[in-house]
Amino acid sequence: MFQKQERIGLVVYLYYNRDARKLSKFGDLYYHSKRSRYLIIYINKNDLDTKLEEMRRLKCVKDIRPSAFDDIDRQFVGNLHRDETNNHQKGYQPPSY
């Protein structure tokens, strides 16, 4: 049966756009911004450490930043109610216009 792989997105900044093909072997190349010279690559989470080490060794890579998608609260239902109760507990008064 098919098992879902845990994946993570990496934003890889390059010195030159011509080096984008070299990085396509590390994972799934999702987006390439030629103007800003960065790539978005998705890789498996269990391979993250080894692939980051290999990518950082390349001379064409300026910087690598992992995605913060896992850190974001994606529970949108009830956010307004939760914020409203927190503001009332702190004594927050909305501005009067």
Curated annotation (Swiss-Prot):
Biological source species: Streptococcus pyogenes serotype M4 (strain MGAS10750)
Pfam families per record: DUF2129 (PF09902)
Keywords: Cytoplasm
Name used for this protein in its record: UPF0298 protein MGAS10750_Spy0325
A single Gene Ontology CC term: cytoplasm
Lineage summary: Bacteria, Bacillati, Bacillota, Bacilli, Lactobacillales
Keyword match Nucleotide-binding: no
Location(s) in or outside the cell: Cytoplasm
Keyword Iron: no
Coiled-coil intervals: none
Family listed: Belongs to the UPF0298 family.
UniProt cross-references to InterPro entries, sorted A to Z: DUF2129
